[in-house]
């Protein structure tokens, strides 16, 4: 579906599912491979509130908007390609790599950040993108 440009939105566990694999100690579990990265489980919890500026137009927002949320995970992504496109620049939180979060490829968006949808138009924008793509 990702290669056909259908909208895919994923947070945290969904992000992990869209990677090539999840490595857990000596075990490796194959995932979907939408993103050319590997998830590696860690012993240490990453728990933060998050605040980000949207750096690129994406499925849920136009660029320059501010997004709030949180992250809560025991994993990190390994071998993130240098040319990866990220939707968010974090001022608070860790994200995927170098305070960047929201991996983008085709019409897929996946992040460690759990976005707070309560007082925003992000859900509406996502639904509009889904409707637009359902009419193709």
Predicted segments, located by residue:
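Amide-donor transfer/coupling interface in amidating biosynthetic enzymes
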Residues: 41-136
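Cysteine-nucleophile active-site neighborhood
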Residues: 1-59
């Amino acid at each position: 579906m990702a290669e056909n440009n259908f909208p895919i939105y994923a947070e945290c566990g969904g992000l992990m599912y869209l990677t090539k694999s999840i490595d857990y100690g000596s075990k490796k579990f194959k995932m979907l491979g939408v993103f050319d990265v590997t998830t590696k489980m860690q012993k240490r919890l990453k728990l933060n509130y998050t605040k980000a500026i949207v750096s690129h137009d994406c499925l849920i927002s136009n660029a320059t908007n501010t997004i709030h949320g949180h992250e809560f995970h025991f994993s990190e992504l390994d071998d993130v390609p240098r040319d990866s496109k990220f939707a968010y620049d974090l001022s608070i939180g860790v994200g995927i790599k170098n305070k960047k979060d929201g991996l983008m490829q085709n019409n897929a968006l996946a992040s460690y950040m759990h976005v707070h949808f309560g007082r925003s138009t992000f859900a509406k924008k996502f639904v509009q993108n889904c409707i637009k793509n359902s009419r193709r």
